[in-house]
């Protein structure tokens, strides 16, 4: 389940989009204003973030607003927390973690 979010977060442009959306919901045009890349490139990055379920979109009138999906971010943070803390289970936990 977490492969797509990690892959999406590997790109610096997508990480910057995430930081922008942390502040408030934005349209694709508002996001594009913060970059020196084409609108189709921004659209591609937004689609990757949507496929990874890190971002959702909602139509309001003629605009589509993008927002963070905090549920998936909670799962990513939970994975990092579990991966960085040693448990009593030892290496058995590593075998279980790779299956998730």
Language-model segments: residues:
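Helix-turn-helix DNA-binding motif, specifically the short coil turn and the N-cap/start of the second
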Residues: 27, 38-41
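Amphipathic alpha-helical dimerization/coiled-coil segments
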Residues: 1, 74-100
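Beta-hairpin "wing" of winged helix-turn-helix
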Residues: 50-60, 67
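Alpha-helical residues within the helix-turn-helix
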Residues: 33, 44, 50-51
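Base-recognition residues in the alpha-helical recognition helix of bacterial helix-turn-helix
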Residues: 19, 43-47, 62
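Short capping segments at the starts of secondary-structure elements
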Residues: 23-29
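Pre-recognition alpha-helix immediately N-terminal to the DNA-recognition helix
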Residues: 15-17
């Amino acid at each position: 389940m977490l492969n797509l979010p990690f892959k999406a977060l590997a790109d610096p442009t997508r990480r910057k989009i995430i930081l922008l959306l942390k502040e408030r919901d934005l349209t694709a045009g508002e996001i594009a204003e913060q970059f020196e890349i084409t609108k189709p490139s921004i659209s591609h990055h937004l689609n990757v973030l949507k496929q990874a379920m890190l971002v959702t979109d909602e139509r309001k009138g003629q605009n589509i607003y993008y927002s963070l999906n905090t549920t998936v971010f909670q799962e990513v943070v939970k994975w990092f927390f579990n991966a960085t803390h040693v448990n009593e289970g030892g290496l058995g936990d590593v075998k279980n973690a790779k299956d998730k």
